[in-house]
Amino acid sequence: MTPLLAAALLFAAAGSGDLALLPPDGAAGGFRRAEATQVFPGAELYGHIDGGAEIFFEFGFERVTVQRYRRGEDEVTLELYRMSDPLAALGVYLGKCGRETPAAGLDARHTAGRHQLMMVRGDFLVIASNETGRETVAPALVGMAHDLVARIPAAPLPDVFAALLPERRVAGSERLIRGPLALGAFITLGDGDPLQLSGRITAASAEVEDAKGRRTVIVAPYPDEATAAAAVTSLRAGLDPAIAVLREEAEGFVFRDYSGRFGRVARAGSRITVEVGLTDAP
């Protein structure tokens, strides 16, 4: 499929709950649509997901299109989560994918197994689930993903992990953060939105290992110095009472968390860096 045709399909899908992007009957080795397509826009996601919808909203969720396919007794459920932008799709993917086990030849970031395939492409997070669990169905998950890759244009992504040098990063530990739910996977800094990300600013995190030891580093880029400075001030004022500030610094502070480990908040220009999980005080 040509890029122009893929873009036309994407435009058409935007007005139809993304139905135009779904693989047709007979795709992936003979699977056919089994039930009416379901579309859950906005807050209706709560009617589709039994827990865990909030992280989608934090990153920026628009709608999910759900289609079930059958081939004899085999069944596959395909979910197309349209997010607000490519980084939103990547953020949810990184938080859910675990250790990636890619299939050969699939030109999109993904992880594939016997029971499920998860893929990020453009503004979409795609989840294909093998409902019967038969090993013979696993290739169909990859086949449907190939079909979707041809229909959904790729989108360029900024290198949000550039500040976390590759030679220091622990592979597979990369995550994105746009609010307190994603941040809470690493540390509870305070109530509300401690880093003032507001679902719009995308912070990057990863485990880093160097002379300081192994720790988690979070880098948040703000629109300007004033916004970053205000975020540090707000964070310091609303810091979780279980966190002890050990030393105030010109543009941040050093702390000990509730587990007895150490961390640092530091601002440099319009960027805030948070280090957590240090064995020794910096």
Predicted regions and their residues:
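Soluble, non-membrane globular domain cores that form compact, hydrophobic packing
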Residues: T2-T77, Y81-P282
